[in-house]
Amino acid sequence: METVLKAISDWIKSLLTAAIMSNLSGLFEDVNTQVGGIAQQVGTKPSSFEPRVFAMIEALSRNVVLPIAGVILTFIACYELIQMITQHNNMAQFEPALILKWIFKTAISVWMISNTFDIIMAVFDVTQQVVANSSGIISGNTRVNDIGLSMLQSSMMQMDVGPLFGLFLQSFFIGITMRILSIVIFVIVYGRMIEIYMAVSLAPIPMATWGNHEQSHVGQNYLRSLFALGFQGFLILICVAIYAVLLQNVAISGDAINSIWSIVGYTILLCFSLFKTSSVAKSILGAH
């Protein structure tokens, strides 16, 4: 009878061991792929990230948004002229130099909305250069290997069925968690670029407000927001570099599950840090 029970126990152990190894095998591949590609993705200019999408955004901005910006600029220029006249006693004390100042301000505003995309790309050229230079300094291996799985497999057959079943539940939860985290990393990195495209699509409207002192804060805040989006890539690289250092501190021992849980915790920390990069960049540059 004991032989039969032992055979059943060994059979259950083999099933649980195979299931655990299946859950843990290639566990970190999705995360490795997403984290490994972060430096390349955040270092790519908006025009190169997805050229067809960028061409569509540029066409919409020039053909749909730019005429609206022209109307706003016309209103602002007329408002400035009327305000200038009324402030000088209906031209009784009007100086000719003031009209030249108005013409100069209006011409600069027209030039800015006409060359909006050149200005926007110059902003991202500066920030992407910072990201490119920092990626050469910030280094570290972020690839997570299947830690001690062969050692874990040999030790599992020595465990009882109860603890082995608990280990199976842990491995199942870890597998789901790591896949969710890989999706979260993908969403954060690609979501930043989509946010850039959305900001660029409406660029002519805030750029049209620079000619008026009362409304220029719209354009100033917009420009700060663009710099924040650009430097967010730099903060993302810093998060990945910290993640790489933390991974190197994970102790590889016979207790592979604890090591894996440590890596899961660090990956969750990475996702949380990536979420915070946007708010940190905006708070530093005073954008809202």
Regions found by a protein language model. Name each.
Residues Q83-T86, K105-I108, A199:
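Sec-exported extracytoplasmic/periplasmic mature domains
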Residues T74-L81, S171-F173, V200-P204:
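Transmembrane alpha-helical segments of multi-pass small-molecule transport proteins
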Residues L81-F94, S182-F186, E214-Q215:
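Membrane-water interface regions at transmembrane-helix termini and the short interhelical loops
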